[in-house]
Regions:
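Sec-dependent N-terminal signal peptides
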Residues: 3-15
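Short, surface-exposed coil-to-beta transition loops
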Residues: 99-104, 117, 126-131
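Extracellular/lumenal glycan-associated surfaces
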Residues: 103-111
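Short, hydrophobic/aromatic-rich segments at coil-to-beta transitions
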Residues: 83-92, 112-118
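Long terminal segments
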Residues: 20-69, 73-76, 126-194
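Functional cores of ribonucleases/endoribonucleases
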Residues: 90-94, 103-104
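Beta-turn initiation residues at beta-strand->coil junctions
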Residues: 92-96, 118-122, 145-148
């Protein structure tokens, strides 16, 4: 009986720890959105954001625009206040291919590790999708996939779980690669700033 009790207690603790982590990430995400909104306000005096916009004409599909916003914190060195370290915490990335709009968000920890990825776009079959990947220090801890079937007006949940299944592995790998790309691009932009 004690063995069953301790097993149940352990399972409940693990579930509780998992939900706390996802809830913590959601809180960090809400904080990042609020901070980004504040920074985007023209009245706000501190604009801790790099913005990159590229525009080009694509043969066969027309105008193409890519916009990436890199939001960061500034941390002063206590020994040398003029020595400021910039820490990326949030990236938005939007682009279009012909008439299709794509949107992505990347949330990073203070140490620059990926914490959350959100992607909304169209798959190879032109179905609208949403991916949400939650991370802890060891890797992915929760995956949520929503998809619009045919001409339904709302996205419906297709998958929710703690692992990346084979069906979503390609999308997951691409999302993680993009998060690393944007972190590297931020580091490059940061090297050009003061």
């Amino acid at each position: 009986m004690k063995k069953i009790f301790f097993t149940l207690l352990t399972v409940m603790f693990c579930v509780s720890a998992f939900s706390q982590t996802v809830e913590t990430i959601r809180k960090d995400y809400a904080d990042a959105l609020a901070h980004a909104k504040q920074i985007n306000d023209p009245e706000y005096p501190v604009n801790n954001k790099f913005k990159v916009v590229t525009e080009q004409m694509m043969p066969g599909s027309g105008p193409h625009q890519v916009t990436a916003n890199f939001y960061y914190y500034e941390d002063e060195n206590e020994e040398s206040p003029s020595d400021i370290t910039k820490s990326i915490y949030y990236v938005t990335h939007s682009y279009n291919w012909a008439a299709r709009e794509y949107y992505e968000e990347y949330l990073y920890t203070r140490k620059g590790k990926i914490e959350f990825i959100y992607q909304r776009g169209y798959d190879d079959d032109f179905q609208l999708y949403e991916y949400r990947f939650y991370f802890d220090a060891k890797g992915v801890i929760k995956v949520i996939v929503k998809r619009k079937k045919d001409d339904d007006s709302a996205l419906t949940q297709e998958y929710s779980g703690a692992t990346v299944t084979d069906k979503y592995k390609k999308a997951y790998d691409a999302a993680v690669k993009h998060s690393e790309y944007f972190k590297g691009l931020f580091d490059t932009l940061n090297s050009f700033s003061y």
